[in-house]
C-alpha cells in the first residue's frame, strides 16, 4: 500500500512540475533557440532525485535540436523556479528529452492508410 501512495505522490508532483515548466516556457525565457514547445509529460524517478521532461517541439528537426540546447542551458533557472513555486526544498534534476509520440503516431497512421488501400484494391 505504501508503494502505491508513493507512486501517486510522484505522479501528482510530476503533473505539478509539468504545469510550472509550461508556465515558465510560455514567457519567462528569452533564449531565441527555444521555439514553440509543449511539455508533454514529466516522469519522476523512483528516488525523486531526477525527472525526465518530455517536450514536443513544433517545426523541423533542427528547431527541435536548437530548442533542446536552449532548454539544457536554462535547466538551472527552470529547476530553481520550479522549486520556489512548488515549495520544494530540492527540485529533481531536470532532463529534457524530445517527445517522439507525435512523429510515431503520424507514421502509424500512414502505415494504416497503406494497409487499408491495399485491402480495398485487392477486393
Swiss-Prot record:
Protein name: Ribosome-binding factor A
Pfam families recorded: RBFA
GO biological process, one term: maturation of SSU-rRNA
Disulfide bond as UniProt keyword: no
Lineage, highest ranks first: Bacteria, Pseudomonadati, Acidobacteriota, Terriglobia, Terriglobales
GO cellular component, one term: cytosol
MF (Gene Ontology): ribosomal small subunit binding
Family in the record: Belongs to the RbfA family.
Biological role: One of several proteins that assist in the late maturation steps of the functional core of the 30S ribosomal subunit. Associates with free 30S ribosomal subunits (but not with 30S subunits that are part of 70S ribosomes or polysomes). Required for efficient processing of 16S rRNA. May interact with the 5'-terminal helix region of 16S rRNA.
PANTHER family: RIBOSOME-BINDING FACTOR A, CHLOROPLASTIC-RELATED
Gene giving rise to this polypeptide: rbfA
Keyword Cytoplasm: yes
Subunit record text: Monomer. Binds 30S ribosomal subunits, but not 50S ribosomal subunits or 70S ribosomes.
Source organism, top-level taxon: Bacteria
Record's subcellular location: Cytoplasm
Keywords tagged on the record: Cytoplasm, Ribosome biogenesis
InterPro entries (alphabetical): KH_dom-like_a/b (IPR015946), RbfA (IPR000238), RbfA_dom_sf (IPR023799), Ribosome-bd_factorA_CS (IPR020053)
Organism of origin: Koribacter versatilis (strain Ellin345)
Amino acid at each position: 500500500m505504501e508503494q502505491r501512495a508513493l507512486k501517486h505522490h510522484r505522479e501528482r508532483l510530476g503533473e505539478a512540475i509539468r504545469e510550472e515548466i509550461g508556465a515558465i516556457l510560455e514567457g519567462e525565457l528569452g533564449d531565441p533557440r527555444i521555439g514553440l514547445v509543449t511539455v508533454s509529460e514529466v516522469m519522476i524517478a523512483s528516488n525523486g532525485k531526477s525527472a525526465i521532461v518530455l517536450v514536443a517541439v513544433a517545426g523541423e528537426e533542427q528547431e527541435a535540436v536548437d530548442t533542446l540546447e536552449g532548454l539544457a542551458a536554462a535547466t538551472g533557472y527552470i529547476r530553481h523556479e520550479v522549486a520556489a513555486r512548488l515549495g520544494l526544498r530540492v527540485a529533481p534534476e531536470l532532463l529534457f528529452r524530445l517527445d517522439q509520440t507525435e512523429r510515431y503516431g503520424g507514421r502509424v497512421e500512414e502505415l494504416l492508410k497503406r494497409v487499408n488501400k491495399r485491402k480495398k484494391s485487392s477486393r
